[in-house]
Amino acid sequence: MASKMCEPLVIGRVIGEVVDYFCPSVKMSVVYNNNKHVYNGHEFFPSSVTSKPRVEVHGGDLRSFFTLIMIDPDVPGPSDPYLREHLHWIVTDIPGTTDCSFGREVVGYEMPRPNIGIHRFVFLLFKQKKRQTISSAPVSRDQFSSRKFSEENELGSPVAAVFFNCQRETAARRR
């Protein structure tokens, strides 16, 4: 069953380009505007993801803590992502079986603003070894590395991940 859960992440090149292969062990749900659920590979326009989503962790218990990272691995464009990855959000110390509003926001939410092509926006959930594992915010949102961040903070592999696609909304044509 775990390989079935990973399949969209492999096809979407999240596993490989963003993180190494892992088996999801916790269920995570991401919902924008109370009714727009994020499913792997689904498309959203920037106008529908302006506010931070509700992210629920369905696993562990109140003594388990999680770190959520949201990144864009396709900056500035998917054909030449030389600024990979762009950090959009970090929330730490999220108790298991709750949502991210119970955690500590280390880096505030930044809405997706893809300029060139279709970008993937990836939510990664890591289980912390203990509370307050993350000591400080990254210096820059640009050229962030999920792998390096996980390693530096001893987070290990993700326990859950989901991504959506997003592209610039077409401007109204003038006549």
From Swiss-Prot:
Transmembrane segments: none annotated. One of its GO terms (biological process) is negative regulation of flower development. Keywords: Cytoplasm. GO terms for cellular component: cytoplasm; nucleus. Its main location: cytoplasm. Signal peptide: none annotated. It is found in: Cytoplasm. CDD domains: PEBP_euk. Pfam families: PBP (PF01161). It comes from the Eukaryota. InterPro entries: PEBP (IPR008914), PEBP-like_sf (IPR036610), PEBP_euk (IPR035810), Phosphatidylethanolamine-bd_CS (IPR001858). Belongs to the phosphatidylethanolamine-binding protein family. Not known. In plants homozygous for the recessive allele of the SP gene, sympodial segments develop progressively fewer nodes until the shoot is terminated by two consecutive. inflorescences. PANTHER family: PHOSPHATIDYLETHANOLAMINE-BINDING PROTEIN, PROTEIN CENTRORADIALIS-LIKE. This is Protein SELF-PRUNING. It comes from Solanum lycopersicum (Tomato). The gene is SP.
